[in-house]
Design a protein with these regions (language model features):
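Conserved coil-to-alpha-helix start sites within the AMP-binding
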Residues: 19-30, 45-48, 165-182, 193
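Conserved ATP-dependent adenylate/AMP-binding module captured primarily in the ANL superfamily
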Residues: 5, 44-75, 145-162, 194-208
Length: 232
């Protein structure tokens, strides 16, 4: 639906995504891919100046945001030197028309994504030693990463993967978002990265895999320890 009716984008362009982890993040990314263009993913908590820096550095043609991020995005766009050439899409303000959905259901659809050495995504470094740098990743780069993970036998199509790492990092982008597309794994979202919400998601959704970093597993440890300490 996003690709057919929301995104007006030529090939070899950029679409910037500034929003929290949610299904619409994935719809936005793949709708950009379906135009044979590249997705730029940045932290949903980016402030207006950080967003403006990315705009001036990459010159995207469309920005996807949410109600949660729209204020900062609008403030950045207002200062952007090419603000007249960019389209803003707030995914929370999209109205899904049933008639159009019915048309899509009857379509033969295959994602027309970038291939080979074509640029598929741009991710920005943290900028701890200076201004963030945009790192362009080709489709081959991402595909190699996915296949390397899958060949380890950690995941298969039966898995329910908990999405707790922000999608603007390469690990969750490949091991959660893109792995889901290629191998039909399922994604479970949490609204807040806190031990209670994570434990609730694990229980309710029969999560079988978690892509994490030490800080995430420290949350698990702290949550379990608090529950144990509360009993004594």
């Amino acid at each position: 639906y996003f690709s057919e009716y929301i995104v007006d984008l030529g090939s070899e362009k950029f679409g910037l995504i500034v929003m929290e982890n949610r299904p619409e993040w994935i719809y936005s990314f793949f709708s950009v891919w379906d135009k044979r263009s590249a997705g730029i993913a940045i932290d949903a908590n980016s402030n207006p100046n950080e967003i403006l820096y990315v705009l001036e550095d990459s010159h995207p043609n469309v920005i996807f945001c949410s109600d949660e991020t729209e204020k900062n995005v609008l403030e950045a766009v207002e200062k952007y030197s090419l603000k007249g050439s960019i389209k803003l899409v707030n995914v929370d303000k999209i109205t899904i028309e049933q008639e159009k959905m019915d048309v899509i259901k009857n379509m033969q659809f295959e994602l027309d994504n970038p291939t080979g050495d074509e640029t598929a995504a741009m991710l920005y470094t943290s900028g701890t030693t200076g201004n963030p740098k945009g790192v362009m990743l080709s489709f081959n780069n991402l595909n190699t990463e996915m296949e390397g993970l899958y060949e380890k036998g950690i995941f298969d199509h039966r898995d329910q993967i908990l999405a707790i790492l922000p999608f603007h990092h390469v690990l969750p982008l490949t091991a959660t978002v893109l792995l889901m597309l290629k191998y039909q794994t399922s994604i479970v979202f949490v609204e807040k990265i806190a031990s209670k919400e994570i434990f609730d998601a694990l229980e309710k959704n029969r999560v079988t895999a978690i892509i994490g970093v030490p800080r995430v597993f420290k949350l698990f440890y702290d949550g379990i320890k608090q529950q144990i300490d509360a009993k004594f």
